[in-house]
A protein has these predicted regions:
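Soluble catalytic regions of membrane-associated enzymes that act on cell-envelope
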Residues: 3-216
């Protein structure tokens, strides 16, 4: 929604005024208590912890590797999270069964930092554990900050001999995903060009076809 407001401000006040009003948000304030030394120490410790976990897998061939699937679904919503919402029949029985404690299931809520767009920033935060809260307003981490190999869940799983695949049912070049995903450790990237006669809703590939591609 922030981008919408910016466009409205440009239209209402003109480009020069809008640009000057945005200048104050282009600088990032140093967090309270921050020091390069403390950050470096925590980074080193995190690396040691990760190395220990990886080293614990002495015989990779003997380790079971369950499929790990993460779905970020812009088209999905449960209106019940907004408050009291009742219907005469369950509108998402499968999802609700999972939430109620289905076998081998853990559920919860994940708050994200974007609304109405900039999905690449949600991906960036989830995959890397970094926050865009420390970046200038309007930043898109994929386009501006991922310029070299960057540690992520994908790269960590590669260390455990997983084959890592990213699927996005739209243009491969969107938010520079085709350039960024390999830097995050993905072995393979499937975009809309890799779908054969998918079902579409308002010109977009449907969730049904997207999930079928995952299963495939």
């Amino acid at each position: 929604l922030g981008d919408v407001y910016k466009r409205q401000m440009n239209k209402r006040d003109g480009n020069i005024v809008a640009f000057l009003m945005e200048l104050e948000y282009m600088d990032v304030e140093k967090p309270s208590g921050y020091s390069p030394e403390e950050t470096g120490s925590k980074y080193t410790q995190a690396g040691q912890d990760s190395a220990g976990l990886t080293a614990a897998v002495e015989d990779p061939e003997s380790v079971k590797r369950p499929n790990i699937i993460v779905i970020m679904d812009e088209a999905f919503s449960d209106l019940a999270v907004r408050g009291d919402f009742t219907t005469n029949e369950d509108y998402m029985p499968f999802i609700h069964r999972l939430q109620q404690g289905a076998e081998n299931t853990r559920t919860g809520y994940l708050n994200v930092s974007v609304l109405g767009g900039n999905t690449a920033n949600t991906e960036f935060e989830f995959l890397t554990g970094n926050t865009i809260g420390f970046l200038p307003q309007g930043s898109v981490a994929y386009q501006q900050y991922v310029q070299k190999e960057t540690p992520s869940l994908a790269s960590y799983l590669k260390e455990l001999d997983y084959h890592t695949v990213a699927i996005h049912p739209y243009y491969a070049s969107g938010w520079d995903r085709d350039r960024v995903y390999p830097l995050l450790g993905f072995d393979e990237f499937l975009s809309q060009d890799d779908f054969t006669n998918p079902k579409r809703i308002r010109n977009y590939i449907s969730d049904e076809s997207s999930f079928a591609k995952i299963i495939e």
